[in-house]
Amino acid sequence: MRYEDLKLNLRKIIEVPGAKAPFSCELSTDELDFPAVVRFDEPLKAEGAVVNTAGILTLKGTVAAKMHCVCDRCGAEFDREKTVELNAGIATDESEEDLFQMEDDEIDLDDILFTSFVFDMDAKMLCKPDCAGLCDGCGANLNFEKCSCKKPVDPRWAVLEQLLDK
C-alpha cells in the first residue's frame, strides 16, 4: 500500500472475533513539521494489523522514522531513529467518541499513524540525554569545553561575598 491510498477496509473482520487485517505502508513526511527536525531521511514506515478481540477492534503495530535533527540545547545536528509502538482502539459505532472512527467499514490509516507518531515525539530533541547545552554568557558548547565566565552570585549572598573580597 502506498501513502496515496491509506484506507484499510475492515468489513471482513468486524463480525469475526480473532480475525486480523494486516497492513504495511509508507507515509510521506512532507506535511510533518517539527522545529527540531531538519529533515526526515525517508518516509515513515508502518506495519501491523487491526485485530478483532471479542468484538473490540484494536490497531497494533509500529511506525518508524529516520530523522536528521538539531539539538534544542546545544544546536548540534544529529541523526535519530524513532519507532513508535501502536495500540489504538477503533470505534465500531459513533457513540465511542474517544476512539478512532470508521467510515463505511474503513479506517483512515494515515490519520491514526500520523497522530500516534506526533503524540509520541519528544517535547525537546536532545543530541544526548545529558546534553549540557550552551553557556548563556559566552556561547561555549558545554558538552566539549568549560567556559571561563564568572558565575553570577545569588543576590542573597552578595553581602557575604563583599566581606570575602576584603
Predicted region positions:
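Structured interface patches
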Residues: 1-166
